Amino acid sequence: MKLFGMIFLIATVAFILLGVLLKLAAFFFVSILTLIAAIVLFTVLKKNQHNQT
């Protein structure tokens, strides 16, 4: 019974850590995508300004 409790505790901790890591990874991924989108948009706007002048 004690062994089962320890396994359950370890599984719960691992599950929580996995959830936190997934949230961090998702946040990191969204941040990188936003940064790339901003750079692309900025480049396109700069190119459009050069074409107009």
Swiss-Prot record:
Membrane topology: Multi-pass membrane protein
Keywords tagged on the record: Cell membrane, Membrane, Transmembrane, Transmembrane helix
Predominant location: membrane
GO cellular component: plasma membrane
Superkingdom as given in the UniProt entry: Bacteria
Transmembrane segments: 3-22, 26-45
Compartments where located: Cell membrane
Protein name: Uncharacterized protein YwmE
